[in-house]
Amino acid sequence: MRRKLAGWFALVGVISAISYAGRFAGGKPPKNALYEYSTAVSELILFAIILALVFWIARGLPKREAFALRRPESWGRAIALGFAVLIAIAIANAALDPLLHGGREQGLTPSGWQSSHAAAFAVNLFAFAIVGPIAEELTFRGLGFYLLEPYGQTVAIAVIGITFGLWHGLVEALPVLIVFGTGLAFLRSRTRSIYPGMLLHATFNAAALLLAVTV
């Protein structure tokens, strides 16, 4: 199990290092990156590679347990916890964004809606709001949480929150991302399922992208 945890840390560390190297060397992506097919293609390829490595690390483990592929005992409780996590994230963002402007750092906010690029935007929405959350939840609140849980749920929640934040390679947005990752890990620990966090993550990303082109 320790070798698998070391492999997981190595994967997360490499992706984090690449993300920060790209952030400091190349800066933000083009302002209208969400209107380019190449953005979605590169993200989909990256997520495919990540998932392949995650499943390779998880080889030999019971997949249902390792990835928490089970329904929560109560969807009502899971939804209530999800709203609580969402409120915590909103409060953190409202408090920190005026100071750090983390919402602008990722550089995925288009200059406005461009109907001529609707198809490319739809593909990017699929990549960032569906495939991305699935891949990241399986990586962090799935395998990562499972491998860290023997050290205690508090440790697992904290480590998952911090590594999830670093994974994105951002500076100003790092505190909010850590809160987001910690909240999703808390949701995973309380529901014993990956699905509520996956739905919350996907909903959050989709709402952020749609608001970016409509507000």
PLM features per residue range, with description:
Residues 14-22, 46-50, 85-93, 168, ...:
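Alpha-helical transmembrane segments of multipass membrane proteins
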Residues 25-26, 96-98, 187-188:
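Juxtamembrane C-cap of transmembrane helices in multi-pass membrane transport proteins
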Residues 87-88, 113, 117-215:
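Transmembrane helix-loop-helix hairpins at the membrane interface
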Residues 4-60:
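Alpha-helical transmembrane segments in multi-pass membrane proteins
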Residues 53-63, 186-191:
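Structural signal for the C-terminal ends of transmembrane alpha-helices
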Residues 4-11, 35-43, 47, 74-82, ...:
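Residue-level signature of transmembrane alpha-helical entry/exit and packing/kink sites
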Residues 31-36, 63-132:
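Juxtamembrane helix-loop-helix connectors linking adjacent transmembrane helices
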